[in-house]
């Protein structure tokens, strides 16, 4: 139960938008709730608030259909409007830590949807992560987020700004906590791009993972179904519910399997020995 073991903090973070962070956060929340866990979410994406909108759509859908779906507890943390930087940072620290503390009382897992860009709130989230998931679009353009790579030899020239930031958060966290940050990079939207190019991205990522210490996970494919589910606030794991007018197809089955694979790869200690129930 949540009392015996402190809630695990999972941060879904990436400097860019558009890599499907909210889709991952939402599906992970529902997967954990379907496994009987209590989940709290914090939406730090101050600009887009996609996760908050996703959950609002979910509530609306339940009201209109009368269906009961698992809902996480959601907390919004706003950026400070203080002009003075020190004051702003201390206000944000206060807001963030009190939200985490509140959710830790009631939850087994806290999922934090990180903001795009390098902000103080984003760093706070990363320093507090037990598991960090970075969704990455499967292309060399997004690859820049992690490191600078020689396009000919695929040799890693230097880690990126984001990788350096994660590294410094890891060092900081190691001073205060016995839980190291387990960093997982997800290759999302593995479009049917030319196999050769895909292999090269894979090779470069493998080189980089050894160098800067993350684990690689296959991500979620580019499927229209994820986009179709957003307006109803549904996830793939809800599609058996009555009233969802989405017809269940083979691609839904495949996508649901991707979620199971992700959960297995995350190796969350709290789920050891548990059956995957979705």
Predicted regions and their residues:
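C-terminal lobe/tail of nucleotide-utilizing enzymes
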Residues: 1-4, 175-278
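P-loop/Walker-type NTP enzyme "switch/lid" segment
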Residues: 9, 13-16, 31-110, 116, ...
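Generic structural signal for small/hydrophobic residues in well-ordered secondary structure
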Residues: 17, 50-51, 130, 220
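Conserved lysine of the Walker
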Residues: 21
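Hydrophobic positions on the alpha1 helix immediately C-terminal to the Walker A/P-loop
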Residues: 24
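Active-site signature of alpha/beta-hydrolase-fold catalytic machinery across serine-
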Residues: 27, 31, 124
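Short, hinge-like loop/turn segments at secondary-structure boundaries
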Residues: 57-61, 151-153, 235-237
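Conserved catalytic-core segment of NTP-binding enzymes
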Residues: 115-218
């Amino acid at each position: 139960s949540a009392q015996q073991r402190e809630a695990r903090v999972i941060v879904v973070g990436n400097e860019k938008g558009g890599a499907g962070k909210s889709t991952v956060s939402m599906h992970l929340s529902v997967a954990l709730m379907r496994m009987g866990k209590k989940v709290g979410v914090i939406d730090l994406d101050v600009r887009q608030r996609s996760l908050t909108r996703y959950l609002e759509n979910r509530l609306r859908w339940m009201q209109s259909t009368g269906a009961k779906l698992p809902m996480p507890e959601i907390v919004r943390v706003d950026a400070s409007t203080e002009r003075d930087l020190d004051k702003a940072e201390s206000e944000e620290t206060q807001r963030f830590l009190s939200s985490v503390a509140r959710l830790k009382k009631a939850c087994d897992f806290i999922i934090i949807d990180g903001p795009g860009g390098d902000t103080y709130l984003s760093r706070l989230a990363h320093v507090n992560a037990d598991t960090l998931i970075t969704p990455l679009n499967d292309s060399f353009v997004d690859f820049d987020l992690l490191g600078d790579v020689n396009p000919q030899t695929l040799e890693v020239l230097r880690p990126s700004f984001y990788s350096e930031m994660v590294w410094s958060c890891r060092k900081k966290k190691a001073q205060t906590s016995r839980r190291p940050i387990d960093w997982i990079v997800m290759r999302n939207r593995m479009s049917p791009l030319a196999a050769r190019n895909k292999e090269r991205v894979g090779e470069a990522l493998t080189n980089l993972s050894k160098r800067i210490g993350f684990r690689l996970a296959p991500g979620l494919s580019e499927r229209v179904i994820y986009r179709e589910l957003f307006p109803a606030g549904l996830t793939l794991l809800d599609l058996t519910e009555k009233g969802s007018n989405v017809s269940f197809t083979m691609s839904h089955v495949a996508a649901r399997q991707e979620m199971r694979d992700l959960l297995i790869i995350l190796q969350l200690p709290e789920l050891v020995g548990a059956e995957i129930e979705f």
